[in-house]
């Protein structure tokens, strides 16, 4: 790895195309991108932002976000990207929790009194509006509101151990944990990603994942620019414009959650198909039938990966051809040490299930202000406990079998919801299936399922029950099925079982 801070992590030739913003009809070379970042860094420094100052970016995907993210990092400040669609109360929580000095928003936000602006004002935090200026080819602070942050500061030069990025884990229960990631963490993750997929200046990524999350940020954007390739960054994913822009800008790959893959499978593909070097899937399990259909439809290898915020995104991935990529598996560890441990910290033999634990330069040193979580989440020799249950096969491929905290304890019998999800999704009339634990008077807990049928198909609880009877033990069959055309997901497309439980079981219970 030739770089240890994001200051040096834009590696393309000066005249090569670095960034495309379709909504602005703008393309920047690497030279122009560096100039724009440095110019915005000067503007941020003039506002008084100094080393260690937290800055929130509440801007949708696009050129302004990219330039702002790098500018904040170059100034040695701490970046806290936020979903621009949050409600005011959500903005208040994250801005206050980070103790932000500045909230960066799109042009027009103050006049529109957007939720981010209202939250910042309530907390007496300064607001800066950004806009792309085509004539100067720079991103400018076009409006500033709030108290003076500090005296103008000199330009910073980031150091490897500077905390650069702070993200909150969505978690399955309780208050979100705060994950600090350093320049060194991020750069090691970038190195792992670029090496595992052999990214180079000939590649162009089409970024469909939000940049306020590590999936889109680390893999889609930062790794592309660090390899000298080009990133195409639309404001959000749109099935209508995906193929048009993918072809127009010469994209060679994309990374997404299974939800987006399935939407693209339902969208008529272009004729002829563009050459796609590979498709990456991450952040949620990809059903093997969907993987097979993706490969057959788009004539490209589909590589499933495994990632977490605490590891600056990627921990394992299936390899590119001609090496084997295995359905059901999230591949091999790449750039990290990985062990399967029991509850006492003993390493499990090959093929036996236990907790997936990882260690590496990309892994955070610990959560902020949370000694209890740090004690329970790291082993004595600093392996991070992912909370995921899994096993290794004889070839060293990782298979995730469930989430430890999500295991259903039905009268002493442990059920993995992920296992039943996978079986249900093999049914020809099931598009999505999410199983979850519910309280039960007799067994303590039982399992129920939310089902999204294939469009135009109808499936009954009895049909699903009969189907599962042939596949799994009787105690694993969900007690009840809920049918819907929309499974609740987080803003990044992840399924959280507690959200599904709230939407179906708790909602139906409240009606009683």
Swiss-Prot record:
Chain residues that bind ATP: 168-179
InterPro entries, per the entry: AMP-bd_C (IPR025110), AMP-bd_C_sf (IPR045851), AMP-binding_CS (IPR020845), AMP-dep_synth/lig_dom (IPR000873), ANL_N_sf (IPR042099), Pcs60-like (IPR045310)
Main location: other
Motif Microbody targeting signal boundaries: 510-512
Catalytic activity line of the entry: oxalate + ATP + CoA = oxalyl-CoA + AMP + diphosphate
Phosphoserine found at: 283-284
SUPFAM superfamilies, A to Z: Acetyl-CoA synthetase-like (SSF56801)
A molecular-function term among this protein's GO annotations: medium-chain fatty acid-CoA ligase activity
Stored PROSITE patterns: AMP_BINDING
Motif (FACS): 381-429
Signal peptide region: none
Highest taxon of the lineage: Eukaryota
One Gene Ontology cellular component annotation held by this UniProt entry: cytosol
Domain topic, free-text comment: The FACS motif is required for catalytic activity and substrate specificity.
Similarity comment text for this entry: Belongs to the ATP-dependent AMP-binding enzyme family.
Record-given protein name: Oxalate--CoA ligase
Organism of origin: Schizosaccharomyces pombe (strain 972 / ATCC 24843) (Fission yeast)
Gene: pcs60
């Amino acid at each position: 790895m030739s770089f240890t801070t994001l200051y040096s992590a834009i590696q393309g030739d000066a005249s090569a195309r670095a960034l495309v913003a379709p909504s602005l009809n703008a393309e920047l070379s690497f030279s122009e991108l560096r100039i724009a970042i440095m110019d915005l860094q000067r503007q941020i420094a003039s506002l008084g932002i100094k080393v260690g100052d937290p800055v929130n970016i509440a801007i949708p995907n696009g050129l302004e976000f990219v330039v702002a993210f790098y500018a904040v990092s170059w100034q040695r400040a701490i970046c806290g990207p936020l979903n621009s669609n949050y409600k005011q109360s959500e903005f208040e929580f994250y801005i206050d929790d980070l103790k932000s000095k500045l909230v960066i928003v799109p042009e027009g936000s103050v006049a529109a009194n957007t939720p981010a602006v209202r939250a910042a004002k309530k907390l007496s935090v300064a607001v800066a509006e950004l806009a792309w200026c085509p004539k100067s080819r720079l991103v400018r602070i076009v409006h500033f509101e709030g108290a003076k942050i500090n005296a103008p500061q000199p330009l910073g030069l980031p150091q490897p151990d500077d905390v650069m990025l702070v993200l909150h884990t969505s978690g399955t229960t309780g208050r979100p944990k705060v994950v600090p990631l350093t320049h060194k963490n991020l750069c090691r993750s970038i190195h792992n990603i670029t090496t595992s997929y052999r990214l180079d200046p000939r590649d162009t990524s089409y970024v469909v994942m939000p940049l306020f999350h590590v999936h889109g940020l680390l893999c889609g954007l930062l790794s592309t620019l660090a390899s000298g390739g080009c990133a195409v960054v639309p404001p959000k994913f749109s099935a209508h414009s995906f193929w048009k822009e993918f072809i127009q800008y010469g994209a060679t790959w994309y990374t997404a959650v299974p939800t987006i893959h399935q939407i693209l499978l339902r969208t008529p593909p272009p004729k002829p198909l563009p050459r796609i070097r590979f498709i990456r899937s991450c952040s949620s399990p990809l059903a093997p039938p969907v993987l097979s259909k993706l490969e057959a439809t788009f004539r490209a290898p589909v590589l499933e990966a495994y990632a977490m915020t605490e590891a600056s995104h990627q921990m394992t991935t299936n390899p590119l051809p001609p090496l084997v990529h295995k359905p059901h598996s999230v591949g091999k560890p790449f750039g990290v040490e990985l062990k399967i441990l029991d509850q006492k910290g003993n390493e499990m033999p090959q093929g036996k299930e236990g907790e997936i634990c990882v260690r590496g330069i990309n892994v955070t040193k610990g959560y902020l202000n949370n000694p209890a979580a740090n004690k329970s989440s790291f082993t004595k020799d600093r392996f991070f406990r992912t909370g995921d249950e899994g096993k290794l096969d004889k070839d060293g491929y990782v298979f995730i079998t469930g989430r430890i905290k999500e295991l259903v304890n039905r009268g002493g019998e442990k059920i993995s919801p992920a296992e039943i999800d996978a079986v249900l999704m093999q049914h020809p009339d099931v598009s999505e299936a999410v199983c979850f634990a519910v309280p039960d008077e007799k067994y303590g807990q039982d399992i129920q399922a939310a089902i999204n049928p294939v469009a135009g198909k109808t499936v009954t609880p009895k049909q699903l029950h009969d189907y599962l009877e042939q596949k799994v033990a009787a105690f694993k069959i969900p007690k009840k099925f809920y049918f819907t055309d929309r499974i609740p997901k987080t803003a990044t497309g992840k399924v959280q079982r507690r959200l599904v439980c709230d939407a179906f079981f708790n909602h139906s219970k409240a009606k009683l």
